[in-house]
Amino acid sequence: MSEAARLIAPEKRGEDLDATMRPQTLDEFTGQAEARANLKIFIEAARNRGEALDHVLFVGPPGLGKTTLAQIMAKELGVNFRSTSGPVIAKAGDLAALLTNLEERDVLFIDEIHRLNPAVEEILYPAMEDFQLDLIIGEGPAARSVKIDLAKFTLVAATTRLGLLTTPLRDRFGIPVRLNFYTVEELELIVRRGARLMGLGMTDEGAREIARRARGTPRIAGRLLRRVRDFAEVARAEAVTLKIADEALTRLLVDSMGLDQLDRRYLTMIAQNFGGGPVGIETIAAGLSEPRDAIEDIIEPYLIQQGFIQRTPRGRVLTANAWKHLGLNPPRDVEASQFRLTLEDD
């Protein structure tokens, strides 16, 4: 199963981009309480001074609301919002075109900034720090450096892999913001809001069941809600109940913990083929026929957060929670081996 085919894949899809479902203000935004509280202060201070907000870096797994927060920030600052992504900016001229079209205090959002071309990144440094573009015009002996003054803008960037950002780029963001997985209670509020906007009846138990299986991710909660709505409408149900939500999600192969076939293949392979681990990431990638990046960025964060696996210097290891969830008995020596690995980590 490819990552793109997964119902619970946290990456954006066309159906996820319904603007009417997005919160429009920080007060409407559910979850990330600490980040929202700080952003409110920074936004109000910048607005009162009539200055551009300092550059902001959002860090966290996909689907947690980085793009939505960037849009809300621009709206609350009362400025224009421009959006792009790291892979799209292929050359310096692409970046120059974006920056020179910005007005004073505008917000430029760059998603996946860790995938920015290194040559483009070099151009970004003076733009962020001095609001100037340093461009080389011409080639060979006729080449000359030209400085272009820019409007004072705010760069809001998002990354799922902070470690891939260079230190010079990372240090130029004055406001780093880490986003965390959402609680079931927060996701339940998001599901309720989505159902209300859809005109869909929803019981407390139905909302909680969808929230429990959404992997701590609002984007996945919205996607599951839409699929459960399909089942409810075909069944001519007046509201989504626990029974309808459970039956729909079970038929979609999303289990009680939000794991799908690929997650279970990951855990089962380590359990049955490698005795619970440790096993290296390259071996896992080959066994699943999935890219290493997809495993590290998409599959493993939630499994680690739920306490199903440990990352150790010698490889991935299943925990007692994973064995229990799979309904398998761990080898007799698994607890002792995990204890030794924990000591090695320390």
From Swiss-Prot:
Disulfide bond entries:
none
Residue positions annotated to bind ATP are R22, G63, K66, T67, T68, E129, D130, F131, R172, Y182, R219
Report if keyword S-adenosyl-L-methionine is assigned. no
Q: Which reaction does it catalyse?
A: ATP + H2O = ADP + phosphate + H(+)
N-terminal signal peptide: none
Q: Give the CC-aspect GO terms.
A: cytoplasm; Holliday junction resolvase complex
**Where found?**
Cytoplasm
Q: Which residues lie within the region annotated Head domain (RuvB-H)?
A: 256-346
Any single GO molecular-function term of the entry would be:
four-way junction DNA binding
| Residues that, per the record, bind Mg(2+) | T67
Residues that bind DNA: R292, R311, R316
Key words of the record:
ATP-binding, Cytoplasm, DNA damage, DNA recombination, DNA repair, DNA-binding, Hydrolase, Nucleotide-binding
Q: What is its EC number?
A: 3.6.4.-
What family does the database annotate?
Belongs to the RuvB family.
What does the UniProt entry state concerning the protein's domains?
Has 3 domains, the large (RuvB-L) and small ATPase (RuvB-S) domains and the C-terminal head (RuvB-H) domain. The head domain binds DNA, while the ATPase domains jointly bind ATP, ADP or are empty depending on the state of the subunit in the translocation cycle. During a single DNA translocation step the structure of each domain remains the same, but their relative positions change.
What the entry lists under NCBIfam families is as follows: PRK00080.1 (NF000868), ruvB (TIGR00635)
Protein name in the entry = Holliday junction branch migration complex subunit RuvB
Organism of origin: Rhizobium meliloti (strain 1021) (Ensifer meliloti)
Q: Which gene encodes it?
A: ruvB
